[in-house]
Swiss-Prot record:
Record key words, sorted: Aminoacyl-tRNA synthetase, ATP-binding, Cytoplasm, Ligase, Magnesium, Metal-binding, Nucleotide-binding, Protein biosynthesis
Co-factor binding details: Binds 2 magnesium ions per tetramer.
Main location: cytoplasm
PROSITE patterns: AA_TRNA_LIGASE_II
Source organism superkingdom: Bacteria
Name of the protein: Phenylalanine--tRNA ligase alpha subunit
Organism: Phytoplasma australiense
Length: 343
């Protein structure tokens, strides 16, 4: 029996050396030596006829032979697979002389570029940036801002109500009210920005959703001159030193007095066109009282800027819809324009 096993070992080594260059031949060898009708199976059958006292030793030799066959075949198969993979990699190697691919580089949306420009300005002036909810209660969106349940000014901001108590905010002033309450009657200097929603008819210059940035300053001895200087700083940042403006009286329930600011655009015939740019005013005493400020001691001013309107005027964009359609041609064109101006 020992001689038979040794002869099979020699035969396997001979056949392996002859057939190891082909994966198909290795599979054939596997069947020949390990399959159901293989040499190894014949050895297992003859084991039945071996005397009992010799079976353990012979069985051990057979198992060692089987293990040798399995490991040898696995080694040669892996070698062939590695060779094949290396050959494929060489054939598929990258030609470094070929031109590369151009990948599109993203950029910040035009509206957020305007917001970031203004945020940088106000941070340099000592303001803090605050954020708040887009879904707001009627109480914080209207009543705390001196716009009662039956106040006619509510018609100016026809709104999207979720239920009788909740609505999509019509301005970012809800953030200001909450910050005033949290500040417990101390000086305050903040800006806030984000989406606001009004039931408007969408057209080239109006949208039911738009971006707004508002500012609020509360301290002792705040007056209209402080507000005017802030407005001039904003205009200078956005449109340069030479931009002419027009300040005219207006009405907002939460400020008194209230103003609106127009850009003065001179046409070729030297006539003037007035483009509304922002609303502002001194904080109404009732709003101060609502937020636990003493109007005899503290005063404040507030302003609100429509970001889309700024961008449309600044970059001569005729249709507000361009900001929301995600047309890559428009966004790329605008991105180049901004980079050119900042360079």
């Amino acid at each position: 029996m020992h001689n038979k096993i040794n002869l099979l070992k020699e035969k396997f080594e001979h056949d392996l050396a002859k057939n190891k260059n082909s994966l198909e031949n290795l599979i054939y060898l596997e069947q020949k030596f390990l399959g159901k009708k293989s040499f190894l199976q014949e050895l297992n059958q003859t084991l039945k006829n071996i005397p009992s006292e010799k079976k353990p030793a012979i069985g051990k030799l057979i198992n060692e032979f089987k293990k040798t066959i399995i490991l040898s075949l696995q080694k040669e198969k892996q070698y062939l697979k590695t060779q094949k993979m290396n050959l494929e990699l060489m054939q598929e190697s990258v030609d470094v002389n070929l031109p590369g691919f151009n990948f599109s580089t993203g950029s910040i949306h035009p509206l957020y570029q305007i917001i970031e420009q203004l945020e940088d300005l106000f941070l340099s002036l000592g303001y803090e940036i605050k954020d708040g909810n887009e879904i707001e209660s009627d109480f914080y969106n209207f009543e705390m801002l001196n716009i009662g349940k039956n106040h006619p000014a509510r018609a100016m901001q026809d709104s999207f109500y979720i239920n009788p108590q909740k609505l999509l905010r019509t301005h970012t002033s809800n953030i200001q009210v909450k910050e005033m309450l949290a500040n417990e009657g101390k000086p305050l200097k903040i800006i806030s920005s984000g989406k606001v929603f009004r039931k408007d008819n969408d057209d080239a210059t109006h949208s039911h959703q738009f971006m707004q940035l508002e500012g609020l300053v509360i301290d002792q001895k705040i007056n209209f001159l402080n507000l005017k200087e802030t407005i001039l700083t904003i205009i200078k940042e956005l449109f340069g030193d030479s931009q002419e403006i027009n300040i005219r009286p207006s009405y907002f329930p939460f400020t008194e007095p209230s103003i609106e600011v127009d850009l003065v655009i001179r046409k070729k015939d030297n006539s003037k066109e007035y483009l509304e740019i922002l609303g502002a005013g001194l904080v109404h005493p009732q709003v101060l009282l609502n937020a636990n400020y003493n109007p005899e001691k503290y005063q404040g001013f507030a302003f609100g800027i429509g970001i889309e309107r700024i961008a449309m005027i600044k970059y001569q964009i005729e249709n507000i819809r361009h900001f929301y359609q995600n047309d890559i041609r428009f966004l790329k064109q605008f991105s180049k324009k901004v980079k050119h101006e900042n360079s």
